[in-house]
Amino acid sequence: MSMLKDPSSKYRAFPVINLPDRTWPSKTIDAAPIWCSSDLRDGNQSLIEPMDAVKKLRFWKTLVQVGVKEIEASFPAASQTDFDFVRTLIEDGHIPDDTTIQVLTQGREDLIERTFESLRGAKKAIVHLYNATSPSFRRIVFNQDKDGIKAIAVNAAKLFVKYAAMQPDTEWTFEYSPETFSATELEFAKEVCDAVIEVWNPTPEHKIILNLPATVECATPNVYADQIEWFHRNINRRDSVIISLHTHNDRGTGVAATELGLMAGADRVEGCLFGNGERTGNVDLVTVALNMYTQGINPDLDFSDIDGVRKVVEECNQIQVHPRHPYVGDLVHTAFSGSHQDAIRKGFAQQKPDTLWEVPYLPIDPADIGRSYEAVIRVNSQSGKGGIAYLLEQEYGISLPRRMQIEFSQVVQRETDRLGLEMTAQQIHALLHSEYLQANTPYALVSHRLQEENGNSAVEVEVASKGQGETNLHWRGKGNGALEALVAGLPIPVEIMDYNEHAIGAGTNAKAAAYIELRVNGERAVHGVGIDENITTASFKALFSALNRSLSQPEAKAA
């Protein structure tokens, strides 16, 4: 079987929402929502190998540390394991005073009774009721009409009131989800939710949560936003209701649907760290939160050690985070492209402390989430001079002049093409050494002596000539400065086109780096590098580096 030529014979387009006066497109997100993690329930039930109690507790502690204040811990009536985990959290004091445990149940009385029993002794708790309301579930799964579906919700809501009254020492919050909300007729979703509201009788001081799931994402995010805004406008007793979002990622737009849903009037977001969950996953709380952060909004969640959080999630879920996952993937702060690297390097050079972040290609400062800058620029065959220069400067304090960056990038390009792999900063530094600092054929500087005479410099250098049977030569010259004197003493006509120097390090361990662009015998200019504790020695080494590289080129040998 293959894809249909006419998919409309099998699939229907999702109907649009009639909301011509929608206001959400002109709204912005200006504050963090209430966050609820469903990692331990919705996320856990989707794992090939669900977490054991040890992993669950480790995950719980991570969520608390990050700052999630509402955590859906389990479906306690589903198994003894889930029930026992809730008891462990309560009895062993793992629930901070500012954090609320949440549990899920269906509408049967035995399940509800067991759920409330699991929460005995909790200071406060959210009990979450759900039943599916969409036409396909009514017809295919439950064989119920609308009245039957509404009766399930209403009867269960009454049981919530009954069993909560038996444990008056707990501060209860009730939550209801018309599961498959996004595929349910809006009028009917409102009808069911209004009926639940009447049973629970919330007030502005003691609100209930109405959670509106895109259980299966079935339309573009703007449609979900229209549904949320319509519900926000029309639900009864809106001032006593917290509207919660629970999106999935079947169409790849769970984050967008959540953000538009918040613009449409929602107050709360349920999801999982890094988007774990059934099928393609729940909305990724980390991405939504850090999207807010990069817009200047405090998300009230702390991902200062995002790699530490990732480690816990990967080990507990036994699922690796994708290297391109927003904010946390191994490659999301990494540039291989030459033009990208050049822009990033220039951005870092101009970025001042305590100013607005404006480094190109990096929407967030990696340091804010505990990342170093080491992996920002990596070099492969697509890389250019900017990335190579950045790595040498950041890792080794070597600041190549601009024209030398171009020349050395060609050397690196040849090496990456040969290897077929990316090069590390260490490999690039080694290549710089072999290409420039070890360029000692045919002339290797052995020693030099410098004297100042009447404002002029006199230089004598001893050179090992490897092209003439390893004999040592002595060249002498005078000039206005050491380099000019050395050039005057060379038996080969050379012209210094450019010279740069800088210190590497500071204090007693500092060294000098010198860079010379040299034209030999009127040929194409090449660069040389010298590094030494003495700046004069470094400049002489740089000149011999350039001289030898020029004389070693094929065109020089042919001449």
From Swiss-Prot:
It is an enzyme of class 2 (transferase). Its cofactor is Mg(2+). Mg(2+) binds at residues 42, 246, 248, 282. Keywords: Amino-acid biosynthesis, Branched-chain amino acid biosynthesis, Cytoplasm, Leucine biosynthesis, Magnesium, Metal-binding, Transferase. Residues 439-559 are annotated as: Regulatory domain. Its main location: cytoplasm. It comes from the Bacteria. GO terms for cellular component: cytoplasm. Residues 33-307 form the Pyruvate carboxyltransferase domain. It catalyses: 3-methyl-2-oxobutanoate + acetyl-CoA + H2O = (2S)-2-isopropylmalate + CoA + H(+). Gene3D superfamilies: 3.30.160.270, Aldolase class I. InterPro entries: 2-isopropylmalate_synth_dimer, AIPM/Hcit_synth_CS, Aldolase_TIM, IPM_Synthase, LeuA-like_post-cat, LeuA_allosteric_dom_sf, LeuA_N_DRE-TIM, PYR_CT. It is found in: Cytoplasm. Pathway: Amino-acid biosynthesis; L-leucine biosynthesis; L-leucine from 3-methyl-2-oxobutanoate: step 1/4. It holds the Pfam family HMGL-like. GO terms for molecular function: 2-isopropylmalate synthase activity; acetyl-CoA C-acetyltransferase activity; magnesium ion binding. GO terms for biological process: L-leucine biosynthetic process. Homodimer. Belongs to the alpha-IPM synthase/homocitrate synthase family. LeuA type 2 subfamily. Catalyzes the condensation of the acetyl group of acetyl-CoA with 3-methyl-2-oxobutanoate (2-ketoisovalerate) to form 3-carboxy-3-hydroxy-4-methylpentanoate (2-isopropylmalate). PANTHER family: 2-ISOPROPYLMALATE SYNTHASE (PTHR46911:SF1), PTHR46911. This is 2-isopropylmalate synthase. It comes from Pseudomonas fluorescens (strain Pf0-1). The gene is leuA.
